[in-house]
Amino acid sequence: MSVALLGAALTATAGGYLTNTNQNVAFLRNPAQDAAINLNGVYSNPAGVSFLKEGFHLGLNLQSAYQTREVTSKFAPFADGANNNNRDTKLFKGTASAPIIPSVQAAWVKNRWAFQFNFALVGGGGKAEFNQGMGSFESQVALLGMVGPKIEADHKGSGFNKYKVDAYMHGKQYVFGTTLGASFRVNDHFSVYGGLRGVYATAHYYGHLKNIQINQGNGANFVPASGYFGFVATTLKGVLAAKPTLASALAPQVRQMTVLSEATKDVTLNADQHDFGFAPIVGAHFRSKYIDVAAKYEFRTAIAFKNESANSESANNLSALAAYRDGAEVRSDIPALLTFGVQVRPVEGLRLNLGYHHYFDKQAKSGLKGAYRNELLNAGTKEYLFGAEYDLNKSWEVSAGVQRTEYPNTDAYMNDLSFTTNSTSLGLGVGYRVNDMVKVNAGYFHTFYDTYHKESANYNNAANLIGAAQGAEAAKALVQHGAVKGSDDFTRTNKVFGVGVELTF
């Protein structure tokens, strides 16, 4: 049970969708930036930067992002939790924050050339904490409530009907990217770009499952589960040694108690991951009096972590945690990205923007070799964007935009520590030009997530654990009778604030 908890949690956290296109406050104001000609183009439309006025341009941005990740899990054995008020449905909520997200964009535009620099969290970043674990954690421990009555039937006064557990998970992940490139204006209407991004990815995961307790004799007092099961196993072994004729009756019980004793031991996992990667980037831009059209392609960034872990012995001995053993190699590639954008200027001062993004998630390797999670996806993520910007006067401009993101999620891919759902995001903000050299931007971005519903006849592989303790036939019967069915409803919240300044020399 301990292994199932941390195995599910950390395997999930190691891989995920790395699709951060928010690298400038201009994105918060209007996410449809794929054909815009501004300093944010150093990331979103680098070929278009050639059409900025000559000089040195520098952008400094600070953002703050806050998320919640909510999973409403339904599983009948949850009702046996001492702190669950006899309810089989439970809300598991994690909080994630990145209070300071810096980014820097710079461009030197001279004649037909624009030499560019970008530093940002290209694959996202921040920290997440789950103070009460997740459904994948607790569902494994909740199975004790199904085992207790059988033990009571076999040994009067030795059973139980309630459990307690201390489950915790904390993770940090940052993917820093530095991009150098240059664009060349072929003529007054067309420009091209080539660049190279270097990525440094770092992650740390800490989790524990400990103090699993049961109420021996169905009473109000709780005792450590592992020690209790070990004591019963030792007692039964003594009886069996004295009376070998009882082997057919006692041997299965000895096996069950031994398995339960091992499964309920404390498990602690402490893993660090680091790696570098590189990706070429190419782009093109077409400009006319009333319309701009742009495209960009970022190649896949291969990230291969090699774990530096200090796990408990109980964790290192568990095959389900193989991906987090010291020295294990885990992939966490940043997928290739193709973007298209159009900007239309129907009247003076008004800019309308359309964009499309396609992430090649299915080709980006994620997880332990031989069990890559990306292979569970249907295709790649798609994003559709629309936005508008209007100049109120020579100093003030206002903007807003919307982004629709559709992920190729499948039931096999979705789990409660590495999930995201389809979403609609709204951004708005203002820009204020202090003078010809200084411009200030401020924006707010809010994401509204859909709910993804997942049902399972064998919730979090719960029957597999019963099978280890009571045999394959017992596990099969549980699935057939619906005793281990369950469901999850996944959703999230996300909000980002940001301010930035652009300097032109």
Model-assigned labels for residue ranges:
Residues S2-A9:
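Bacterial N-terminal signal peptides
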Residues G15-L28, A32, I37, I101, ...:
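Outer-membrane beta-barrel porins/channels
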Residues L10-K127, F419, F445:
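N-terminal, post-signal peptide beta-strand-biased segments of exported outer-membrane/organellar beta-barrel
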